[in-house]
């Protein structure tokens, strides 16, 4: 009886935490998308929530911004509090109200996204720019690297004196290639991706 109650309680807590994470993720993604739509003046198309197949399952990318000045692969983090970490650390730390929370290094997370996008094309590496954008009231307490920024730095970081790389025809090809390879946006695709993540976690567990 006790084990049944514990199981039910665990499921309820897990569901609630999952909903909270998804809600926070959606807020961050909306803020990034709205900022780009309002202030980024270069010719571009923004692809959101891009799920692509990989050799080991799937990867899900918050944003792929295809612009005439490059292909930006963007990971969004809607966090507040103090953020500690570094490019080479496997985990970073959020400190909020004296509570410490560990989370995966988003640079490493986004590197996998970047390599998946790069694999679709035969373009120079410098055409692809990874960015991690924090959209909450976070304060960086250590050097997180040049490609980790706050939302209010996004537009300046996107432009940053970059030369034009693609004409309209090339941009259309890049967008079409990603759209052709991505899985259809749906709840089923999201659940499929989550199941792949759970499977990888189980495989790593002793």
Segments and roles (model prediction):
Residues 1-59, 66-71, 80-82, 91, ...:
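Surface-exposed interaction regions that form or flank ligand-binding interfaces
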Residues 85:
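Acidic/histidine-enriched active-site and ligand-binding environments that engage anionic O-linkages
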């Amino acid at each position: 009886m006790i084990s049944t109650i514990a199981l039910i309680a665990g499921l309820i807590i897990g569901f609630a935490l999952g909903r909270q994470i998804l809600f926070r993720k959606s807020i961050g993604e909306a803020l990034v998308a709205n900022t780009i739509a309002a202030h980024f003046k270069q010719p571009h198309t923004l692809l959101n929530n891009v799920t692509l197949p990989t050799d080991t399952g799937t990867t899900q990318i918050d944003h792929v911004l295809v612009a005439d000045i490059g292909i930006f692969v963007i990971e969004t983090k809607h966090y507040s509090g103090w953020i500690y970490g570094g490019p080479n650390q496997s985990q970073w730390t959020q400190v909020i109200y004296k509570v410490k929370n560990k989370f995966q290094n988003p640079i490493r997370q986004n590197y996998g996204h970047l390599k998946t996008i790069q694999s679709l094309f035969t373009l120079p590496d410098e055409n692809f720019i990874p960015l991690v954008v924090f959209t909450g009231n976070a304060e960086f307490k250590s050097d997180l690297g040049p490609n980790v920024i706050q939302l209010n730095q996004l537009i300046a970081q996107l432009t940053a004196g970059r030369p034009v790389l693609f004409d309209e025809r090339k941009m259309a090809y890049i967008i079409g290639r990603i759209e052709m390879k991505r899985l259809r946006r749906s709840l089923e695709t999201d659940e499929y991706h989550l199941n792949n993540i759970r499977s990888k976690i189980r495989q790593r567990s002793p």
